[in-house]
């Protein structure tokens, strides 16, 4: 299987050498690194080429690497039911540079790109309707970025008196925290209930 994927990677690299930066096979899947501005051309080739026939776009997501100048890996997962193979195509971008939309190549990319924008803030140029899809339209920030606070910025709740959803600053009430003072990880030398049975 890995040999056929490596051959496919060589075929893709040989045909699209100006658009593809490289490839490797890992965990039974072919991983291709492409130029961001050529992503539509690369995916169209993968869909239409007789040796590829990746007719199904399964997902688009991103990975956040805040320490890199090109902070985001935008990842496209494709499936070829004709070849019984999967491929992962990755492009790199930053917060300001838009990745070309691939809705014209795979119509299912519409909501995938919206989700990636909503969760990571990755921009897609020429998208027909790039707006939030999972969070509220007034949501502040991008929740899957590594620099997004775990508690969020605001708390959303329904106010029965006002009969509407209200936004409030996050309040963390300490008295509801459950601290385990009997934890063996604290270096204590006492016996926990039930430990006495283990000594017999």
UniProtKB/Swiss-Prot annotation:
Disulfide bonds: none
Catalytic activity: a quinone + NADH + 5 H(+)(in) = a quinol + NAD(+) + 4 H(+)(out)
Keyword Acyltransferase tagged: no
Membrane topology reported for the UniProt record: Peripheral membrane protein
Transmembrane region(s): none
Superkingdom of the source species: Bacteria
Compartmental location: Cell inner membrane
GO cellular component: plasma membrane
EC number: 7.1.1.-
Top enzyme category: translocase
InterPro entries: NADH_DH_suC (IPR010218), NADH_quin_OxRdtase_su_C/D-like (IPR037232), NADH_UbQ_OxRdtase_30kDa_su (IPR001268), NADH_UbQ_OxRdtase_CS (IPR020396)
UniProtKB keywords: Cell inner membrane, Cell membrane, Membrane, NAD, Quinone, Translocase, Transport, Ubiquinone
Molecular-function GO terms, alphabetical: NADH dehydrogenase (ubiquinone) activity; NADH:ubiquinone reductase (non-electrogenic) activity; quinone binding
Protein family membership: Belongs to the complex I 30 kDa subunit family.
Subunit structure: NDH-1 is composed of 14 different subunits. Subunits NuoB, C, D, E, F, and G constitute the peripheral sector of the complex.
Role according to the record: NDH-1 shuttles electrons from NADH, via FMN and iron-sulfur (Fe-S) centers, to quinones in the respiratory chain. The immediate electron acceptor for the enzyme in this species is believed to be ubiquinone. Couples the redox reaction to proton translocation (for every two electrons transferred, four hydrogen ions are translocated across the cytoplasmic membrane), and thus conserves the redox energy in a proton gradient.
Protein name: NADH-quinone oxidoreductase subunit C
Organism: Parvibaculum lavamentivorans (strain DS-1 / DSM 13023 / NCIMB 13966)
